[in-house]
């Protein structure tokens, strides 16, 4: 059984007991979280496609930890002018364990 779920504008294919990295959420580590924007739900041979979401479907998960992604360097330079700037950025992510997919 798997589902396609939309979390913070991004789509994830999830199954039970799967760890996913979502954009940073406000919940504390250890708290439970549920998602109700299920776009597609597959159970054995039955596939339900939402219009736009599957009614009554819900995914339960648990927030494991908050982490940062790899550092991205933004470097700007203008030739012959002596202008250069260097800026770094690390995006925040939340690690979520998918515990259950409910219809």
From Swiss-Prot:
SUPFAM superfamilies the UniProt entry points to: L21p-like
Family indicated by similarity:
Belongs to the bacterial ribosomal protein bL21 family.
Q: Share what the entry says about its subunit structure, partners included.
A: Part of the 50S ribosomal subunit. Contacts protein L20.
Looking at the keywords, is Transferase present?
A: no
Q: Which PROSITE patterns match?
A: RIBOSOMAL_L21
Pfam families recorded: Ribosomal_L21p
PANTHER family, alphabetized: 50S RIBOSOMAL PROTEIN L21, LARGE RIBOSOMAL SUBUNIT PROTEIN BL21M
| Name of this chain's protein | Large ribosomal subunit protein bL21
Citing just one GO molecular function, the answer is: structural constituent of ribosome
Q: What is the protein's known function?
A: This protein binds to 23S rRNA in the presence of protein L20.
Q: GO cellular component terms? A: cytoplasm; ribonucleoprotein complex; ribosome
GO BP annotations listed: translation
Q: Which InterPro entries match?
A: bL21-like, bL21-like_sf, Ribosomal_bL21, Ribosomal_bL21_CS
Keywords assigned: Ribonucleoprotein, Ribosomal protein, RNA-binding, rRNA-binding
């Amino acid at each position: 059984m798997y589902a396609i779920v939309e979390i913070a504008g991004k789509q994830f294919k999830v199954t039970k007991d799967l760890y996913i990295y979502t954009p940073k959420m406000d919940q504390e580590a250890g708290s439970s979280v549920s998602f109700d924007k299920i776009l597609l739900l597959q159970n054995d041979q039955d596939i339900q496609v939402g219009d736009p979401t599957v009614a009554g479907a819900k995914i339960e998960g648990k927030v494991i930890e908050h982490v940062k992604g790899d550092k991205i360097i933004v470097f700007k330079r203008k030739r012959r002018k002596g202008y250069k700037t260097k800026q770094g950025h690390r995006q925040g992510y939340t690690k979520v364990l998918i515990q259950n997919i409910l219809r």
